[in-house]
Curated annotation (Swiss-Prot):
This is Moesin. It comes from Bos taurus (Bovine). One of its GO terms (biological process) is T cell migration. It is found in: Cell membrane; Cytoplasm, Cytoskeleton; Apical cell membrane; Cell projection, Microvillus membrane. CDD domains: FERM_B-lobe, FERM_C_ERM, FERM_F1_ERM. Pfam families: ERM_C, ERM_helical, FERM_C, FERM_M, FERM_N. GO terms for cellular component: adherens junction; apical part of cell; apical plasma membrane; basolateral plasma membrane; cell surface; cytoskeleton; filopodium; focal adhesion. Coiled coil: none annotated.
Length: 577
């Protein structure tokens, strides 16, 4: 039995290991990968490897894996990557896994600066990436530093602004909070809808020369071929849609494109190496095939996939709505519980206050009772003294009469009797005054006692009212092929039909232009980052982008502009570059 070969395939978020036979073809390995990860939109993807010369190459599906220039390592290493890009992610990418694989690959290209992304867009994209990873922002869970382990912005953007890690996190967090209620899958799609408007998104660049020998860039993408000047890969100067091309071929380093317009000359350029022309041919054929397919009715398979995706999305939305409803109910129950606890605490505090007031009133009552007793004792003492004084007065009266009688009996001298009479009269007068004073004091004590008695009655009534307040009960708790590398020439006929005239891509607008919310966010971020920007660290791409913005250009306006005039005019323009 032939010895098996170990293979390791790295997708954007997983590592897969397989054991293949020496006669296993590229297609068999590819099919095994897509089956393992559950991917059905296979036409966008391919398997990439590093050949023995160090170049990254796409695995040919119609040849044996071992017959290709794969480095003889163990295991054999491959990357599962998007080879072709959709025109419109929201219309073409059906499965969640397809969207996620594109999201992860595009995000990596942006972070590595393989796709130029302006700072304000980079921050907004970062917030969608965070929403897709963490879901809704929750201050109880997402504490300060929760993004410390995430790579979210291109190094260029970090170096161009005088902001530390915490300040970047604060800005991304603000926009993360803005996405509350957005499904993670929707955040992935929103990221891609904005990213697909970036000028370098989905473009494969190749260094070429025209007949004059001018060094230029050829950009191959989902919409056609574009020509760029050597120092500007953001702004194409000439464009040829796939619908204008009928044949592509190369002979060694010379590449020839034959337009559908018979009056137009051939479009000829030169690549530095034969292998580059092979790769250009393969990309042209694949992108042209997908361009034509999009302009035809969906196949039964695609219709079924879309129907299934709609059903799955509807199911997720229902589940989400159910979860949100349960969450709201739980939050309401928590709030109600907190309210009851708060009311309970307030009532307990009120009860405590009433108890303190009752205790204080009781103490005052006891004090008033004690004082009333003291006053009663004082009154009795004053009354007793008054009675004593009255008795003494009576005795004095009797003594006076006795003296008078004695004077008669003893016949004392008039002077002595007068003296004694004067003394007795003075004594009687003093006693009378003392008696009146004591009676007055007794009356005063009687009035004070009466007032105390009234206060006592009033306090007893208040106490009775306080004690009668009812007790408050406690509340209840609640996925063509590159040509054979041995051939120095190859040709491909790019079939066209009535659908070829459909150039609807020229009518497209950017997500920021369509979506007021995105437009508003980008405007706010531009303003917010302006003060922290270090102008001395601007790159050539930054300056090109700024100039394009100043002139009101975007990816689709530029596309319309570079396709103006007939094919011959544009080819002549290319030759004169």
């Amino acid at each position: 039995m032939p010895k098996t070969i170990n293979v390791r395939v790295t997708t954007m978020d997983a590592e897969l290991e397989f054991a293949i036979q020496p006669n296993t073809t590229g297609k068999q390995l590819f099919d095994q990968v897509v089956k393992t990860i559950g991917l059905r939109e296979i036409w966008f993807f391919g398997l990439q490897y590093q050949d023995t010369k160090g170049f990254f190459t796409w695995l040919k599906l119609n040849k044996k894996v071992t017959a290709q220039d794969v480095r003889k390592e163990s295991p054999l290493l491959f990357k599962f990557r998007a080879k072709f890009y959709p025109e419109d992610v929201s219309e073409e990418l059906i499965q969640d896994i397809t969207q996620r694989l594109f999201f992860l690959q595009v995000k990596e290209d942006i972070l590595n600066d393989d796709i130029y992304c302006p700072p304000e867009t980079a921050v907004l994209l970062a917030s969608y990436a965070v929403q897709s990873k963490y879901g809704d922002f929750n201050k109880e869970v997402h504490k300060s530093g929760y993004l410390a382990g995430d790579r979210l912005l291109p190094q260029r953007v970090l170096e161009q602004h005088k902001l530390n890690k915490d300040q970047w996190e604060e800005r991304i967090q603000v926009w993360h909070e803005e996405h509350r209620g957005m499904l993670r899958e929707d955040a992935v799609l929103e990221y891609l809808k904005i990213a697909q408007d970036l000028e370098m998104y989905g473009v494969n660049y190749f260094s070429i020369k025209n007949k004059k020998g001018s060094e230029l860039w050829l950009g191959v993408d989902a919409l056609g071929l574009n020509i760029y000047e050597q120092n500007d890969r953001l702004t194409p100067k000439i464009g040829f849609p796939w619908s204008e091309i009928r044949n592509i071929s190369f002979n060694d380093k010379k590449f020839v494109i034959k337009p559908i317009d018979k009056k137009a000359p051939d479009f000829v350029f030169y690549a530095p190496r034969l292998r580059i022309n092979k790769r250009i041919l393969a990309l042209c054929m694949g992108n042209h095939e997908l361009y034509m397919r999009r302009r035809k009715p969906d196949t039964i398979e695609v219709q079924q996939m879309k129907a299934q995706a709609r059903e799955e999305k509807h199911q997720k939305q229902m589940e989400r709505a159910l979860l949100e409803n349960e969450k709201k109910k739980r939050e309401m129950a928590e709030k109600e519980k907190e309210k009851i606890e708060r009311e309970k605490e307030e009532l307990m505090e009120r009860l405590k206050q009433i108890e303190e007031q009752t205790k204080k009133a009781q103490q005052e009552l006891e004090e008033q009772t004690r004082r009333a007793l003291e006053l009663e004792q004082e009154r009795k003492r004053a009354q007793s003294e008054a009675e004593k004084l009255a008795k003494e007065r009576q005795e004095a009266e009797e003594a006076k009469e006795a003296l008078l009688q004695a004077s008669q009996d003893q016949k004392k001298t008039q002077e002595q009797l007068a003296l004694e009479m004067a003394e007795l009269t003075a004594r009687i007068s003093q006693l009378e005054m003392a008696r009146q004073k004591k009676e007055s004091e007794a009356v005063e004590w009687q009035q004070k006692a009466q007032m105390v008695q009234e206060d006592l009655e009033k306090t007893r009534a208040e106490l009775k009212t306080a004690m009668s307040t009812p007790h408050v009960a406690e509340p209840a708790e609640n996925e063509q092929d590159e040509q054979d590398e041995n051939g120095a020439e190859a040709s491909a006929e790019l079939r066209a039909d009535a659908m070829a005239k459909d150039r609807s891509e020229e009518e497209r607008t950017t997500e920021a232009e369509k979506n007021e919310r995105v437009q508003k966010h980008l405007k706010a971020l531009t303003s917010e980052l302006a003060n922290a920007r270090d102008e001395s660290k601007k790159t050539a791409n930054d300056m090109i982008h700024a100039e394009n913005m100043r002139l009101g250009r975007d990816k689709y306006k530029t596309l319309r502009q570079i396709r103006q005039g007939n094919t011959k005019q544009r080819i002549d323009e290319f030759e004169s570059m």
